[in-house]
């Protein structure tokens, strides 16, 4: 790894930044508390960026990059971190988007996540748990914390399928097998087919990115495993719709029946800038209850939203409830709460205490 790049990566770690952006004939930038900030005296000519990129890539990565003009991979940087790289071209020039992955797997508490409900989900022996959100919302960290909890608290075989491998897990009470796409398996679906012969108790799917993978994931759950995965969806109802739509229309009723029986929890998250410099997650949480299972089966998204609003006892809440809580706590300002809200009016009523809930604007 080029010395100049190591220095830049050290800057990321020392400043607790989440990522680094490098492009030719420009200063490098870090992403700090959600915002892009230039690194002083870091101007890099195009040729130097190209040398950096090629020094990081192995033969396989270079072959993929030269064929597709983009490639993902992860690298260790000696003792100060692990990094996920995306090398790509723009206007014919090589650029790098690099995300920091801590060497230590964070706990739920360190991530400011609701540990009680996530531990309860993680303790499930069979079913489907989904963590969803847009790129950069913290999905990978949340799943890593869940896998780490399982690894420390039950005996079994954890199989992860990732593109690329990010957090590194070591055997504890479980043995952990980590597969990387393009290195250990050609695809998610191929890995899931092979997984049934590898005796896993828990399967982590890095991303349910297309209908074929979604169908394979549901099939894996039906054979008796606990399956965890991520999706790029913004809320619970969109997640359920995306899963159902992965199947032919004539199977939708049957799929809803399957999902009502198989889903153990859905966690949708967003990272928000806080009043004090930093970021906090806001979560929408769905937990499998008899009422939730019935509403999934009957395809009643509006009623499902109300069930989450009224499901605090089970650990459920909507995004707007999470935002109102963060605002009342003083963690985020009103502008942030309103801009991230599903219903800005509902947020205002909740903050002012009108009717004591969000129901008044959702009837």
Residue ranges and their predicted role:
Residues 1-363:
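Short, flexible helix-loop junctions that flank or precede catalytic/ligand sites
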């Amino acid at each position: 790894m080029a010395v100049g790049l190591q220095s830049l990566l050290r800057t990321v770690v020392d400043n607790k930044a989440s990522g680094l952006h490098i492009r030719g004939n420009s200063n490098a930038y870090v992403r700090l508390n959600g915002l892009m900030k230039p690194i002083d005296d870091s101007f890099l000519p195009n040729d130097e960026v190209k040398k950096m990129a090629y020094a990081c890539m192995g033969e396989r990565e270079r072959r993929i990059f030269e064929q597709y003009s983009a490639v993902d991979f992860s690298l260790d940087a000696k003792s100060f971190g692990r990094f996920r790289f995306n090398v790509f071209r723009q206007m014919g020039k090589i650029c790098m988007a690099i995300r920091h992955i801590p060497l230590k797997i964070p706990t739920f508490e360190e991530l400011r996540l609701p540990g009680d409900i996530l531990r309860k989900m993680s303790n499930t022996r069979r079913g489907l748990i989904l963590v969803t959100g847009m790129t950069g919302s913290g999905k990978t960290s949340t799943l890593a914390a869940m896998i780490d909890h399982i690894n420390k608290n039950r005996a079994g075989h954890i199989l992860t399928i990732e593109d690329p491998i990010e957090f590194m897990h070591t055997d504890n009470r479980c043995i952990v097998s980590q597969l990387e796409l393009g290195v250990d398996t050609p695809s998610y679906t191929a890995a899931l087919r092979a997984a049934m012969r590898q005796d896993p108790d828990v399967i982590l799917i890095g991303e349910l990115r297309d209908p074929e993978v979604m169908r394979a994931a549901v099939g894996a759950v039906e054979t008796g495993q606990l399956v965890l995965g991520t999706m790029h969806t913004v809320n619970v109802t969109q997640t359920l719709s995306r899963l159902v739509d992965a199947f032919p229309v004539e199977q939708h009723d049957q799929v809803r029946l399957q999902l009502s029986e198989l889903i153990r929890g859905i966690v949708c998250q967003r990272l928000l800038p806080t009043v004090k410099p930093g970021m906090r997650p806001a979560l929408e949480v769905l937990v499998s209850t008899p009422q939730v299972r019935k509403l999934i089966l009957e395809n009643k998204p509006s009623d499902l939203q109300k069930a989450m609003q009224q499901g605090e006892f089970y650990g459920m809440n909507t995004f707007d409830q999470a935002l109102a809580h963060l605002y009342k706590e003083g963690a985020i300002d009103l502008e942030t709460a309103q801009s991230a809200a599903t219903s800005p009016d509902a947020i205002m009523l909740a903050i002012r205490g009108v009717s004591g809930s969000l129901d008044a604007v959702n009837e």
